[in-house]
């Protein structure tokens, strides 16, 4: 079997739950020919890529798929690019709020996902699933771990991707701005089966 390292984040800001980690927890341990290895990341600048690096060294996965939360869409978003910028609109869970800082000094401005995002989205759309391409993973900790993963694993066989998942109904006053966790998890399973 192939190995998939999949990550999600703890809650941050005003939220008491994070659908990215909820979804990771709800996924089965095996999907298609992937054996899933689950890892929770904290919303803290500067520390979480180290956890990913340790897990990658230990597991030698075929694919690294990181999940984050997106309050701006009910689609599942497959991000195409990570930028070399920390630019927080809100504090992390330790109160840090970096502003206009590079993630890697003198590093490339951006990296593209090594996961074949366009092919995956096209396939999901053919199945009428609410999956879309994202052209920014923001400048918060999602982007930081995505950028550092691509920076460190760009020339390896491991595929690296980032997926933003929508809020859950219990997190919003208007349920039309959210997607039930069961639906998100089912769509993620389809995406993983297609990698």
For each of these PLM feature ranges, what is it?
Residues 71, 166-169:
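Glycine-rich beta-alpha junction loops
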Residues 14, 142, 168-174:
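Short active-site-adjacent structural elements
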Residues 134-167:
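Active-site oxyanion/phosphate-handling segment shared across diverse enzymes
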Residues 1-137, 151-155, 176-183, 189-195:
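N-terminal catalytic or cofactor-binding beta/alpha core of small enzyme domains
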């Amino acid at each position: 079997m192939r190995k998939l390292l999949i990550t999600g984040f703890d809650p941050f800001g005003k939220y008491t739950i994070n659908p990215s980690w909820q979804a990771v927890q709800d996924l089965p341990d095996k999907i298609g020919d992937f054996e899933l290895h689950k890892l929770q990341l904290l919303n803290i600048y500067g520390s979480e890529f180290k956890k990913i690096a340790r897990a990658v060294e230990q597991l030698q996965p075929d694919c690294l798929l990181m999940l984050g939360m997106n309050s701006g869409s009910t689609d599942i978003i497959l991000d195409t690019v990570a930028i070399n910028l920390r630019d927080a609109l809100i504090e992390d869970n330790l109160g840090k709020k970096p502003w206009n800082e590079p993630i890697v000094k003198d590093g490339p401005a951006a990296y593209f996902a090594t996961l074949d995002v366009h092919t995956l989205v096209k396939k999901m759309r053919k199945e009428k699933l609410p999956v879309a391409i994202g052209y920014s993973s923001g400048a918060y900790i999602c982007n930081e771990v995505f950028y550092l993963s691509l920076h460190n694993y760009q020339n390896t066989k491991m595929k690296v991707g980032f997926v933003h998942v929508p809020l859950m109904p219990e997190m919003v006053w208007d349920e039309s701005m959210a997607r039930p966790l069961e639906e998100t998890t089912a769509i993620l399973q389809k995406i993983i089966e297609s990698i």
